[in-house]
Amino acid sequence: MEREYEKNFYVEKASDIAARAQYDDNGFAKVELLPGVYHGGIQSFKCFLKAGHKVSPELFADKSVVIFFGKGEGELTDCDGVHKITEVAFYVPFMDKEKYEIHAIEDMEFVYNVIEMNQWDRAAFDRWHIRLPYFRLHSECVQYIQDCKGPNTEARMILCPKWHGRIILGTTRAVGEGTVEKGHPKVHQLNYCLGDSDFHMSVGYKAENNMETVQHHAGDWSFIPAGADHDLVSDPGKEVYYIWFEHYTDEQAMAKM
């Protein structure tokens, strides 16, 4: 397959992200992640909200948003009431139809993803999508089994295929193992590291013997272009814990699925 990107993977470390954070008078900072790298229609931002402060994120009529709450306790208030954020959590607002507000009880960190919707995305969304707004704590999400993952690896599905356009969302968590995956030729993958993460991410093309490895820790962000093989595995006693966020590359084909 023709490769769109020069590198096997792109990484931004948590410390570098935090160093770029500039707080406003409301205790809020937003930093774009890997700016200019992924040109497939998703912009991701690491957000920091200090304890005791609130933020009402921007609403979009023609774009969708997915939020990963990775650190710190808080509350999210929307048309369904008050959602307690007591662990890793996920939120998909109903575009510009319903407002919402995030209140930090502790210092919070979360990733705010803005997804463009072209004509194919919009047609698929209008035909069928999950009821929005959608809030889930990580522990409420269904577990799944996959043959590329270790026997003691916990995997959870957050957004199944076609639930919300071309995006697919889940988590992987383990100690001393992880996932060893063949490249997905039609799926780009973004990763957000959580918990006590300390693991190896190796990406490339095994048939070409060009795998490259980077050490990942909590708060790190990475992008794996479609097609690359990828292993995310921790050493004994170390944790691998990350959110994977996939974007299907062929919107016309997916619209027909």
Name each region found by the language model.
Residues M1-G41, N118-V180:
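A short, N-terminal "cap"/entry segment at the start of jelly-roll beta-barrel domains
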Residues M1-Q43, C47-V88, K97-K99:
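Generic N-terminal amphipathic/basic segments
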Residues K97-E101, A228-D231:
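Short, charged beta-turn/beta-strand-edge "cap" motif at the junction between a beta-strand
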Residues D78-K97, A207-A226:
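Short acidic-glycine-tyrosine-enriched beta hairpin
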Residues Y5, I105-D147, D235-M257:
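Double-stranded beta-helix
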